[in-house]
Design a protein with these regions (language model features):
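N-terminal secretory signal peptides that target proteins for export/translocation
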Residues: 1-10
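Extracellular/periplasmic carbohydrate-active domains that bind, remodel
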Residues: 34-477
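Bacterial Sec-dependent N-terminal signal peptides
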Residues: 15, 23-38
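Sec-dependent signal peptide recognition
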Residues: 9-17
Length: 477
């Protein structure tokens, strides 16, 4: 979501004296309230970190679940993650990492009895055998799974290939805590950085004005014991970047992964867990081209994917072009939507984007599965949403598109266009698909829904709600 994240907005500054006294400078009333909550969360997480021992992080061994993969007993962690103030500022999940091989067999042993459960992604329809408190199943070639038992914190399984081959010749972060210079890890060109499992980078990661950079491994980028607001893993004006395998744990307001004016970026098998306001998952901005996401678990408090262009004056108007995401799972809190293009789109064009096989396993507040809220002047065109599956029962919001001025618009407003949008093989319990063009010269047109199911049935032409500044929005079954 863009409303709090434009460069035009101020961030508050936290000064820490002796690790205990905080002075907040230049805050609005809302920011003071949020900061007070963050301070409480930070103090609690810091106290927790002193008792965990193994990773010096807000992670303790889970007593709720055991996980056995191919007869290998995994470490299962109970993680405390950042959350909205109205949810107490924190939430617990249980996590385990595993290395995927074909035909992987999984056994989950729960600490107490249960009746109902959901294993996501549902689209795989994996046969599960339940024997008392045990669940067993064999997984296909997919890497992320979520087990939800009513009334309990979920179990999240994060799989990936073996990355050990990247270690040779790399800058290695061994298991343990590592601190960036002034809280930032600035990565350099022509280097591979390897995160051993159990390695924790305590600070933000900045990949800026560099090329040929790899950050790979099963460690964590984690500021939960010392949260600092702002975007967390940043790829700016860089080319030929690989991000693979690691976990992202941000404990303050800010997008978890953000990219601007970067190209030829490959992101796979990340696991993100941050559930506060403006904790978008995987975000792209102006000038991003040939960026590819795959097999990522996106635990977010705001938009799962947020692709936009927030500041033409600072970032230019190079098109957001030819970017793709596939086989990712979204586990989202009660702000934002599953997939968002917008709302700030201060660039020349946004085009040739594809989202395929995206599973929205949780969307707490019933937000739209897909939204293109267009508040600026870009030509938005040639976008495909294929195999988007919103598993949220009782959701009433499927698709939203509009072209209009709102709080995220550039002060000098110019309307844009939306055209050539395709929805293929999508599923949602919601039926509402709403379209609002701006005027006869700035329309929403040529939108197709093919083999889409809503509310447990085939989508109908009558499900489309559109104003007079739209054209050729069709449903085909």
């Amino acid at each position: 979501m863009n409303s709090n994240m434009k460069q035009k907005k101020k961030y508050w500054i936290i000064s820490i004296f002796f690790g205990m006294m905080f002075t907040v400078l230049s805050c609005t009333g809302v920011e003071k309230s949020l900061q007070a909550n963050e301070t409480q969360v930070e103090n609690k997480l810091a106290r927790m970190a002193s008792t965990t021992g193994q990773l010096d992080s807000p992670m303790v061994k889970s007593l709720a679940y055991q996980v056995i993969v191919n007869n290998d007993t995994l470490d299962v962690w109970q993680e405390t993650c950042y959350d909205l103030a109205e949810n107490g500022g924190q939430t617990d999940v249980h996590t385990a990492l595993f290395t995927y091989v074909p035909g992987t067999q999984v056994k989950i042993i729960c600490s107490s009895s249960f009746s109902n459960f959901t294993l996501s992604p549902k689209r795989l329809d994996i046969p599960v055998t339940k024997n008392g408190n045990e669940l067993t199943f064999t997984i296909p070639e997919y890497y992320n799974y979520a087990l939800a038992i009513p009334g309990r914190a979920p179990l999240l399984l994060f799989g990936s290939p073996d990355y050990s081959a990247y270690k040779q010749g790399a800058v290695v972060f061994a298991k343990g805590i590592h601190h960036g210079v002034n809280g930032v890890f600035k990565l350099e060109s022509n280097k591979t950085y390897y995160l051993e499992e159990g390695a924790i980078l305590r600070g933000k990661v900045l990949i800026e004005n560099v090329s040929n950079v790899k950050l790979i491994g099963r460690g964590y980028i984690d500021d939960r014991t010392a949260p600092v607001a702002g975007n967390f893993v940043k790829v700016y004006r860089s080319q030929h970047v690989e991000l693979r395998g690691f976990g992202v744990r941000h404990a303050a307001l800010g997008w978890q992964v953000d990219m601007v004016n970067s190209s030829n970026v490959d992101v796979s098998h990340l696991n993100l867990l941050s559930f506060g306001q403006n904790n978008d998952g995987l975000d792209l901005g102006s000038g991003c081209q040939d960026v590819h996401f795959s097999h990522c678990f996106i635990g977010s408090g705001d938009d799962g994917f947020g692709w936009h262009a927030t500041n033409a004056a600072a970032d230019g108007e190079t098109p957001l072009l030819n970017c793709h995401a596939h086989d990712c799972m979204i586990w989202k809190n009660q702000v934002g939507v599953g997939i968002r293009i917008g709302s700030s789109l201060e660039t020349s064009s946004v085009e040739q984007l594809t989202f395929k096989d995206i599973d929205i396993a949780k969307m707490a507040w019933g937000g739209h599965s897909v939204a293109i809220p267009h508040s600026d002047w870009a030509d938005v065109k040639n976008i495909t949403f294929e195999g988007i599956r919103d598993e949220t029962s009782g959701n009433t919001r499927f698709v939203l598109m509009y072209i209009k001025q709102n709080a995220n618009s550039n002060p000098v407003y110019r309307p844009g266009t939306i055209s050539d949008i395709r929805f293929i093989d999508c599923v949602s319990s919601a039926t509402a698909a709403i379209f609002e063009g701006y005027d006869a010269d700035h329309m929403i047109k040529d939108v197709t829904f093919k083999n889409v199911k809503v509310g447990g049935r085939n989508m109908l032409q009558s499900d489309i709600v559109a104003n007079s500044f739209t054209s050729n929005i069709t449903v085909v079954n």
